[in-house]
Amino acid sequence: PLDGRIKTKRPDTPEGPGGEVEMRLSTLPTAFGEKMVMRIFDPLAAVKTVEQLGFGAAESQRWAELISRPHGIILVTGPTGSGKTTTLYATLKSLATDEVNVCTIEDPIEMIEPAFNQTQVHTAIDMGFAEGLRALMRQDPDIIMVGEIRDLATAEMAIQAALTGHLVFSTLHTNDSAAAITRLADLGVPSYLIAATVIGVLAQRLARTLCPACKVRDEDTDRDALDELSKPWRMSGGVRPYKAVGCLSDCLYSSEQHVQGTGREMTT
């Protein structure tokens, strides 16, 4: 098995020069030959602002209040590909100023952001998350982002950073916000330290939305069935169904250009 990354450039267009695109590659030998998976990252499209994440007004307000806290641990949870890193990057970018030292330890560095001091995990030289976090503590950080809390050593270093007055962001692979507490306890973190340092958890998913440039009203929908289905949510003004069409200019006929974040927050 091999992992690697390739950087290339999009073709120039009449609107301007093509930007840089990064491709993340993973290969695996199988019974029928080499299998390859490629993930394409557009740095300009990936780094969003907090307002572009797609959360509702109430969730955005609670998140803004949470990240304004001076110290503690804030966790973002969800399955692989649910937008955890994008949320963290957008949040850190909103907090990074000339007076704020934002440091990250990642594996791998998903997107290069000049506003952060980013460090790559290197297991070959015995620098994992815990070792990298220990080194970051001597770099006078104000805000720290740990790519993922995978073991007790990393959790202990994150807790130590929070107890010494730092704001720490990290991710966990759990299905909901409450399970993040259970996950930390399973790693061996004492409950009193969890209560003293974890100030909030955001459980996140991605929901596809239709391309706003080409979607059209669906007049063939069974209104009675739709009203019955949407009754528990008490939507004001009723539900207006749309259907996918596809266009060349915005969604390249995929009909699903936009992906919107949904989240459930738990604060302490």
Predicted segments — roles?
Residues E15-P17, T30, D42, S68, ...:
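A generic structural signal for short, solvent-exposed coil/turn residues
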Residues I40, Q52, T123, Q204, ...:
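Active-site donor-binding loop signature of nucleotide-sugar glycosyltransferases
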Residues G78, D107, G263:
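Active-site glycine-centered loops adjacent to acidic/histidine catalytic or metal-binding residues
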Residues T174-T268:
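Cys/His-rich Zn2+-binding cysteine-cluster or related metal-binding knuckle/ribbon modules and their
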Residues L2, G19, R24, F32-E34, ...:
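A generic structural signal for well-ordered coil/turn residues at beta-strand boundaries
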Residues P1-S82, T87:
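N-terminal "pre-motor" subdomain/linker immediately upstream of P-loop NTPase catalytic cores
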Residues A64-I67, H71-I74, T85-R208:
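Switch/coupling sub-region of P-loop NTPases
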